[in-house]
Amino acid sequence: MVYSSPISLWEKTASEPDVTRSGFAAHGLPDRTIDVAIVGGGFTGLSTALHCASAGLEAHVIEARAIGFGGSGRNVGLVNAGIWLPPSKVRQSLGPDYGPRFLRRFSDGPQAVFDLIERYQIRCEATRTGTIHAAHAPSGFRALRTRHGEWRDMGEPVDLLGPGEVAGLTGSAAFHGGLLDHRAGTINPVGYVRGLARAARAAGAGLSIGVQVKGLERDGDHWRVRTDAGDLKARTVVLATNAYTDSLWPGLRDGQTVIHYFQIATEHLGARADDILPGRQGLWNTAPIMFSFRKDADNRLLIGSMGRILGTSEDGITQRFARKRLQALYPALGDVRFETAWHGRIAMTPDHLPRIHQLAEGLWTPIGYNGRGITTGTLFGQAMADLLTGMDPMDLPLPVSIPRAARGAGLKSRVFDLAFSANQIWKGLF
């Protein structure tokens, strides 16, 4: 089995070319003051670059590793509407002005993603047949019934499904019901992020790959971005690093708890997988330690859960865990071989809401996506471009904020890591 070589299965199977390896990328840093420098080459950074360049701003992305190297390339690939919180909790947290606006924009989030895919002909295996939030227990179904009622009251296309209906969509009788969200779908996330890079480059944005940002300094009316390849001057800087935020800006990463999420993919299963998720919906469940499940375009099955990869051999904990989950869901499937495994990071905030921080004059960071990176990164990239072209910050989907340390964030990360490892060990061995 191949482990994170170097990113995920998605990198191997993406049909969208990487423009930074095809002779199209400008690796040099501009020697003039530009409008916006963007640190990070994932969904957020490239959406920001695309929308800024399309609006006539000179934008340049600086990425230390490779396009999609962080959470964007390690994503499950579920293009979901909304966030983890149900609509009532969002209204309660954001109030009567921001709450409805946030819900409207995030309800439309999948449409924004699929519109970009269509407009720029991004090759990312886009499938829009919905996603399934599956009840792991009767308590999970009760929570889904409440969530369903709230979305239906807003006129959104979601269906509450009984156990038999979920079995028909998944090929498994293991679930206690579910919520089918017709707004949503699935993609190859590396294909999508590469497509954003191609579109941003075509719109005039610059890309510097393999360049590490070392520091930020305010210099008169602009920022000096210090890198290991020289300095770049920009009137505005957007930090687009989310769960991969380092110590570049003091205290920024202290506002979120970082957890890990792993995935493991089977070999090609061919016709053996035809009756499993025949509509190719992606699925995740209501369990406290979440489990996700989907198929790729080549009929591989992808199993995911919270935590890191534990062992890469056939007797490794993660393979045992995944094998037992598959046996429980599809006892007739028989034994399968696993081909690829990887894990990535998720940035969790205390209230499960994302943030748009203004760190200083002309310095912004969208951050804290709580596992909803595809839609949030895409939407917040558009929001950054809107801000930089004159939109009133009051028109954002949530208030501009400043970083605040999340109490015990580092300790929580370690505790979660231990709990997720224990979950894998217990379910993999017993």
Residue ranges of each PLM-predicted region?
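Extreme N-terminal leader/targeting segments of oxidoreductases
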Residues: M1-V36
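Glycine-rich active-site loop/strand segments that organize a redox cofactor
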Residues: R74-R105
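Active-site substrate-recognition segment that forms the wall
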Residues: Q111, R119-T127, V213-G215, D231-A271, ...
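C-terminal catalytic lobe of FAD-dependent flavoproteins
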Residues: R308-D315, Q319-G428
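Glycine-rich FAD pyrophosphate-binding loop
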Residues: S54-R74
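Rossmann-like flavin
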Residues: S93-A199
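N-terminal Rossmann-like FAD-binding beta1-loop-alpha1 element of flavoenzymes
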Residues: V36-V61
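Helical element adjacent to the flavin cofactor pocket in flavoenzyme catalytic cores
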Residues: E150, G178-R235
